Amino acid sequence: MARGSRCLRRAVAECIRNLPSTAGRETPGKSGVRYLSSCGILMTRAPPLFRAVSSRAVVAPARSFFNFAESSNKRKEYSERRIIGYSMQEMYEVVAKVEDYLLFVPWCKKSDVIFRRSGFCKAKLTVGFPPVVENYTSLVSTVRPHLVKASCSDGKLFNHLETVWRFSPGLPGYPRTCTLDFAISFEFRSLLHSQLATVFFDEVVKQMVSAFERRASKLYGPETQIPRELMFHEIHHT
């Protein structure tokens, strides 16, 4: 039994000696595979140039993890314009009533208006989308029935968050319609949270207008039927 164990240990030791080094050198052969140490992945300085196989060498610029994070931590914008089968006044009332957001806005967990005056209100909002929950104050300016503009004033997750809703007349001959313009711009405060941009975009931003439209349907009944050839829906995002 002891003899078998010694043979096994020798075989394992021989395999380890034959493994390629992970110290950053190239292995011989046609594959050209280069093994890097784990700490080398996080180096912000480009590694030393290796000897070219031919007389002409092509060196790709190094890009660190930190550079990638910085490039993704930029302001993102999304805008949408569509014809809605509800009046300007109806859609304005839905958007301006911030205290009801927790009932239908995607991932809104809490919405409390703490101050209100004509054309302005301040609200405490809690928005949760896995794995983050954010509490922030929203400053909301309104112009009935044309505009609702909200901005984040003290969030720890967002460096910038602003939404703008505009309502204008809809189709001629269809009085209970309006043209709705929705725009949102946001930027995460930390490099780590910036990786959540795609989640926030898909789970919250892209569903926003549809959520308010469904709320209008619940409050005011079915929307005005618009002929397909007159329907309009335009989306932009960066």
UniProtKB/Swiss-Prot annotation:
Instruction: Extract the GO molecular function terms from the UniProt entry.
Output: ubiquinone binding
Q: Where in the cell is it found?
A: Mitochondrion inner membrane
Which GO annotations describe the biological process of this protein? cellular respiration
Q: How does it sit in the membrane?
A: Peripheral membrane protein
Q: Which InterPro entries match?
A: COQ10-like, COQ10_START, START-like_dom_sf
This protein's superkingdom? Eukaryota
* Keyword annotations of the record: Membrane, Mitochondrion, Mitochondrion inner membrane, Transit peptide
Q: Where is the transit peptide?
A: 1-35
| Record bears the keyword Mitochondrion | yes
Gene3D superfamilies recorded for this chain? 3.30.530.20
Q: Name one GO cellular component term.
A: mitochondrion
Job description of the protein: Required for the function of coenzyme Q in the respiratory chain. May serve as a chaperone or may be involved in the transport of Q6 from its site of synthesis to the catalytic sites of the respiratory complexes.
Family per record: Belongs to the COQ10 family.
On assembly, the entry states: Interacts with coenzyme Q.
| UniProt protein name | Coenzyme Q-binding protein COQ10 homolog B, mitochondrial
